[in-house]
């Protein structure tokens, strides 16, 4: 049987960036890793309804900077920034260093593998037919410009006695092309029949130029020059 390598892991440092970017010596490494895990665990649980795609953690000069990628930034920020301030205090307590929280909006949630998987599990938990949920996710992604998408669900589908796996694919999903920008993520639906696993692969196109092309910042908008009165 052909086994699949993790699509994100194989592309790290080629076209994918790490979710935690920091350096530490041997003594500090384990503590940093443990606090990263606890921060992610806390934020994922606290922001379960905020459509969080990914959490990026950086550690500049004895502090921690957390960037939350979400499709619903208003829920994370709260009224006048109250909620995000509460989160910042808890993150600072967990990490033991001053914390800063940034919010990044996911503009197209239909093209984000984690949000697509979460959308499918919420439908499965509401007893929507799994084929309908899969097909809807695939159609939405292709309509918004995905080059290809594959969705796989496994478990006691439709309450069947024997668990099975079903998948649906549209377009191209090249798993071996390292320069391919493939967004992959998983999620679990907890139904009355048991747990149903959902996997989503979304192919967004090829990235030429490696990490330099990925990390290149967008050019800032230049202010328009104002014409002086009386001059043409």
Curated annotation (Swiss-Prot):
GO-annotated biological processes: translation
Residue stretches making up the KH type-2 domain: 39-107
CDD domains from the UniProt entry: KH-II_30S_S3
InterPro entries listed in its UniProt record: KH_dom, KH_dom-like_a/b, KH_dom_type_2, KH_sf_prok-type, Ribosomal_S3_C_sf, Ribosomal_uS3_bac-typ, Ribosomal_uS3_C, Ribosomal_uS3_CS
Pfam families: KH_2 (PF07650), Ribosomal_S3_C (PF00189)
Superkingdom of this protein's organism: Bacteria
Keyword Ribosomal protein (UniProt): yes
Subunit structure: Part of the 30S ribosomal subunit. Forms a tight complex with proteins S10 and S14.
Family: Belongs to the universal ribosomal protein uS3 family.
Name of the protein: Small ribosomal subunit protein uS3
Organism: Yersinia pestis bv. Antiqua (strain Antiqua)
């Amino acid at each position: 049987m052909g086994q699949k390598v993790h699509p994100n892991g194989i592309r790290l440092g080629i076209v994918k960036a790490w979710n935690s970017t920091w350096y530490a010596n041997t003594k500090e490494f384990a503590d940093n890793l443990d606090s990263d895990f606890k921060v992610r665990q806390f934020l994922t649980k606290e922001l379960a309804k905020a459509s969080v795609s990914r959490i990026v953690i950086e550690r500049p000069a004895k502090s921690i900077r957390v960037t939350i990628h979400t499709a619903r930034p208003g829920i994370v920020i709260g009224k006048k920034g109250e909620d995000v301030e509460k989160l910042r205090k808890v993150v600072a307590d967990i990490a033991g260093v001053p914390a800063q929280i940034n919010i990044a909006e996911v503009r197209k949630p239909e093209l984000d593998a984690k949000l697509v998987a979460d959308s499918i599990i919420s439908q499965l938990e509401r007893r929507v037919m799994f084929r309908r949920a899969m097909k809807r996710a695939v159609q939405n992604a292709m309509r918004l410009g995905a080059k290809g998408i594959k969705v796989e669900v496994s478990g006691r589908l439709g309450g069947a006695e024997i668990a099975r796996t079903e998948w649906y694919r549209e377009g191209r999903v090249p798993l071996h092309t390292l320069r391919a920008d493939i967004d992959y993520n998983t999620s679990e639906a907890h139904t009355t029949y048991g747990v149903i696993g959902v996997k989503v692969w979304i192919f967004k196109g090829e990235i030429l130029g490696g990490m330099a092309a990925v990390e290149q910042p967008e050019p800032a908008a230049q202010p328009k020059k104002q014409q002086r009165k009386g001059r043409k």
